[in-house]
Amino acid sequence: MMTEQLLAGLYEGIAKEAVLINEPLKNHTYTKMGGLADLFLIPSTYEETAFAVRYAYEHDLPLTMLGNGSNLVVRDGGIRGIVLSFEKLTDISVEGHELIAQSGAAIIQASRIAYDHALSGLEFACGIPGTIGGALIMNAGAYGGEVKDCLHSATVLTRKGELLNISHEELELGYRTSCFSKKEYIILEGRFSLTEGDPALIKEMMDDLTHKRETKQPLEYPSCGSVFKRPEGYFAGKLIQDSGLQGARIGGAEVSQKHAGFIVNIKDATATDYISLIRHVQETVQEKFGILLEPEVKIIGEEA
């Protein structure tokens, strides 16, 4: 429970209207589910962000970062402490062959701005629904490309609010992983090194990838995207389909009938429904094929 004294202290460094109390997280996730955040902060500047990070550290408050909630399931019990939203930190700029994007910017928008400047390297991201921050954390990728291929560096805060610049090597980018899985950095922006390209060829590739996404993915329902990582030598969606799980349902959550790698919220699903279906899929695939599917989606928060 947040005390009046804690709130008063927060208001010294962040606008009062940017502090939401007991905010429903279902309003901030692609799956449209999740419990309440004790405090939901929406800073508009790096200064406000650094203040909030330092405040959480100095007052021993749990701190959770949130982009646009596209690859996330928040449990029905919600999140204690502070949830720090980057929804207002969305600036994107271009300097020569480099594109600089704030953490809350949509990576789809970054790919479009790169195209506008005839810069190649971010075409793969034209259908990824996440933010720059989320894309860096998980080394997001699609259709043969990934963040690792073009990310130059990142500007971050430590939990004490100190500003650092992290090089490509220090980011430790691997398949759906990075240094952020073990180091508690708060990402402010990413800097991408791109190359000059033919606008017609860039557009052709982006149009092709967008068409593939729209025809193969269940975009008509809320979801967190691809639920599982690709097991070596296999495709998660194919294993799920071959296990007879396409259309399987728990509560309002269903294994998509359009693409078995997705679990969709077809009717007022709770996070408990969604997570239970993830577990059911894992158990069934392991029993049938001896392969344990590892979730790509991040599951956070407390049980109801």
Swiss-Prot record:
Q: Which terms does the record give in the GO molecular function aspect? A: FAD binding; UDP-N-acetylmuramate dehydrogenase activity
**Active site: residue positions:** 176, 226, 296
Q: Which organism is it from?
A: Exiguobacterium sibiricum (strain DSM 17290 / CCUG 55495 / CIP 109462 / JCM 13490 / 255-15)
Which superkingdom heads the taxonomic lineage of this protein's source? Bacteria
User: Which coarse location class describes where this protein primarily resides?
Assistant: cytoplasm
Task: Provide one Gene Ontology biological process annotation.
Answer: cell division
Entry protein name: UDP-N-acetylenolpyruvoylglucosamine reductase
Which pathway or pathways does this protein act in?
A: Cell wall biogenesis; peptidoglycan biosynthesis
- State the Pfam families in the record: FAD_binding_4 (PF01565), MurB_C (PF02873)
UniProt GO cellular component terms: cytosol
Q: In UniProt terms, what function does this protein have?
A: Cell wall formation.
Q: What class of enzyme is it?
A: oxidoreductase
Q: What is its EC number?
A: 1.3.1.98
FAD-binding PCMH-type domain: from which residue to which, for each copy? 33-212
Q: Which reaction does it catalyse?
A: UDP-N-acetyl-alpha-D-muramate + NADP(+) = UDP-N-acetyl-3-O-(1-carboxyvinyl)-alpha-D-glucosamine + NADPH + H(+)
Location in the cell: Cytoplasm
The record's annotation in NCBIfam families points to: murB, PRK13905.1
Q: Which UniProt keywords apply?
A: Cell cycle, Cell division, Cell shape, Cell wall biogenesis/degradation, Cytoplasm, FAD, Flavoprotein, NADP, Oxidoreductase, Peptidoglycan synthesis
What InterPro entries does this protein map onto? FAD-bd_PCMH, FAD-bd_PCMH-like_sf, FAD-bd_PCMH_sub1, FAD-bd_PCMH_sub2, MurB, MurB_C, MurB_C_sf, Oxid_FAD_bind_N
Family from the record = Belongs to the MurB family.
- Cofactor(s) this protein requires: FAD
